[in-house]
Swiss-Prot record:
<feature type="binding site">
    <location>
        <position position="76"/>
    </location>
    <ligand>
        <name>Zn(2+)</name>
    </ligand>
</feature>
<comment type="function">
    <text>Involved in the maturation of [NiFe] hydrogenases. Required for nickel insertion into the metal center of the hydrogenase.</text>
</comment>
<dbReference type="Pfam" id="PF01155">
    <property type="entry name" value="HypA"/>
</dbReference>
<dbReference type="GO" id="GO:0051604">
    <property type="term" value="P:protein maturation"/>
</dbReference>
<dbReference type="InterPro" id="IPR020538">
    <property type="entry name" value="Hydgase_Ni_incorp_HypA/HybF_CS"/>
</dbReference>
<dbReference type="GO" id="GO:0036211">
    <property type="term" value="P:protein modification process"/>
</dbReference>
<keyword id="KW-0862">Zinc</keyword>
<comment type="similarity">
    <text>Belongs to the HypA/HybF family.</text>
</comment>
<feature type="binding site">
    <location>
        <position position="92"/>
    </location>
    <ligand>
        <name>Zn(2+)</name>
    </ligand>
</feature>
<dbReference type="InterPro" id="IPR000688">
    <property type="entry name" value="HypA/HybF"/>
</dbReference>
<feature type="binding site">
    <location>
        <position position="73"/>
    </location>
    <ligand>
        <name>Zn(2+)</name>
    </ligand>
</feature>
<feature type="binding site">
    <location>
        <position position="2"/>
    </location>
    <ligand>
        <name>Ni(2+)</name>
    </ligand>
</feature>
<protein>
    <recommendedName>
        <fullName>Hydrogenase maturation factor HypA</fullName>
    </recommendedName>
</protein>
<keyword id="KW-0479">Metal-binding</keyword>
<keyword id="KW-0533">Nickel</keyword>
<dbReference type="GO" id="GO:0008270">
    <property type="term" value="F:zinc ion binding"/>
</dbReference>
<dbReference type="GO" id="GO:0016151">
    <property type="term" value="F:nickel cation binding"/>
</dbReference>
Length: 113
């Protein structure tokens, strides 16, 4: 379950930022996890709830945004929604498709007090 290592990394990053800002509490955290990032959102939330116990973010609200996954056809330039890595362009039928969004995993925002 790599979601626990991701949750621990997020906790470490937020803890470091909270220290820099001399915050006493983290009240909200927003993550972005693309559909193609390989992250199971519910598992991440579960692991995160365990990882924050006893920290300044223990009571923080965790929000996870899942952006649309998009591909770009390198033949005709069509941009379209994708569900996986091996995708055919709906316009020209080419398989020369580059994934342009949906693989990301990042901290979008944190709210500190």
């Amino acid at each position: 379950m790599h979601e626990m290592s991701i949750a621990l990394s997020v906790v470490d990053a937020i803890t470091a930022r909270a220290r820099e800002e001399q915050a006493e509490k983290v009240t909200a955290i927003e993550l972005v996890a693309g559909k193609l990032s390989g992250v199971e959102i519910e598992s991440l939330k579960f692991c995160f709830s365990a990882a924050v116990r006893g920290t300044i973010m223990e009571d923080a609200e965790l929000m996870v945004t899942v952006p649309l996954s998009e591909g770009l056809c390198e033949v005709c330039g069509e941009r379209f929604a994708v569900d996986g890595y091996y995708t055919q362009c709906p316009s020209c039928g080419s398989y020369k498709v580059r994934i342009v969004s949906g693989k990301e995993l990042s901290i979008r925002s944190i709210t500190l007090e």
